[in-house]
Amino acid sequence: NQEEFKLNLEELKINRKQKLSSVSYGQQKKAMLAYAFALHTPYILLDEPTNGLDITSRQALKRIISRSMDDESTLLISTHQAHDFENLLDHLVILGKGEILLNRSLDEISNRLLFARTDILPAESIYSEQDLSGHFSILPNEDGEENTPDIELLYKAVLQQPEKIKSMFQ
């Protein structure tokens, strides 16, 4: 879709009149992302799509993804920057040491696990990290409380406590 390609280029602040070979790698990457989403292919595979992008370009990419994806599209993102895509995910696969450690929908994760910030460490905590504001913990979601999974905290928990996390989904 040419109109969408133009819109994506504008969103990512790419000059359409400049030759791709004359711009920086970052600008080339943004142009390729703009093109990929304008194609409306059923599958898009991205490896570290936000590496090398500044904050405004990352935000623009999220807007493009939100606008471009639908129920007929699958977007597979390999990234170490999970927070860049937290609000766009509906399924999560965590890999470690060549194995699939977690493969669940975000709905299932939030139904089974509660991500909570507390002053004291809850006894039932599956995984927790402490900072100046208290403990950020993953707990069993026994009451079905609505919450948003913290992907980075979950990633660390899956790597450090794989059996505990796995047991929450059995």
Regions found by a protein language model. Give the residues of each.
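Catalytic Walker B motif of ABC-type/P-loop ATPase nucleotide-binding domains
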Residues: 44-48
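Conserved catalytic motifs of ABC-family nucleotide-binding domains
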Residues: 40
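C-terminal coupling/interaction segments
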Residues: 127-170
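ABC transporter nucleotide-binding domain
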Residues: 61-76, 80-138
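Helix N-cap at the start of a conserved alpha-helix in ABC-type nucleotide-binding domains
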Residues: 55-57
